[in-house]
Amino acid sequence: MAITMEAIKKLRAMTGAGLADVKKALTEAEGDMDKAKDILRQKGQAIAAKRADRETANGCVLAKVGDGFAAIIALKCETDFVANNADYIKLTQEILDAAVAAKAADLDAVKALTLSNGLSVEASVTERSGVTGEKMELDGYNVVEGEYVCAYNHMGRNGLCTLVQTNKPAAEQAHVICMQVAAMKPVALDEKSVDPKIVEEEYNVAVEKSKQEQVQKAVEAALKKAGINPAHVDSEAHMESNMAKGWITAEDVAKAKEIIATVSAEKAASLNMNMIENIAKGRVNKFYKESCLLNQEFIQDSKMSVKQYLQAADKDLTIVNFKRFTLVAD
């Protein structure tokens, strides 16, 4: 049967599929609109299955605040060409709108929601995959429940969005802190919010680093005392290349190796652990300052912390929650 242009336009509007694909599906379905939609959907599923191992490094990330509920979501794809497509962005927005309206708790709940096309979110993403020929997947679903939430959408190549919740109305300050979260990548709200395992790991790493530094200082001092430049013997490769250049002799290398082995062992056995632990604690405090939102230097004035900035606006103002998602690994 002849396929009318009206039918083609209608199916394209319903699915977003290409002209050739729509015409082929309608022809195969003998003009049956529902069958043609199923054919296009099956094509999308086949494409998605074939490209399951592809990397989805691009996409669209959006954030939205609703009635007592805010969310971030990402619809990821393979190329920025697809990510920048108006229909692709529109689909991401519709998924986010549905998630916020339904106050979906997690990504599985989002996937089960029904969109305006009558399909589930999951089926709609698969259908769009068939249209574009690229693998697509949902990711980065973060939610904040309650009042006084601000959303920040940074529309750039890194696909970055943030949510910040304050304990009272403070739209201006919340927006500024949204940008702080975007730029400074905090991992926790304050010291109490950091996972104890992370703190323990940071402390242990700091202890080992401090030990190595003290041993290295002792070794360098001993080498200099022996008339050997520490930079010439800091690795086997440097020793070999510096001998070839005539900067040091084989005797210098032998002497340096003996000094390094002896002094390293002696210093490691006699380290002042109280000093080491104090240095490590200082490094953990630095970690807090860099990684905890309220402790961070305020991006607009490094002389104050985020906490001080908030209290300057209102002594009772603080942040109670924040979320951040980006397509680019930090």
Please annotate each region the language model reported.
Residues 2-330:
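N-terminal assembly/interaction segments in proteins that build large macromolecular machines
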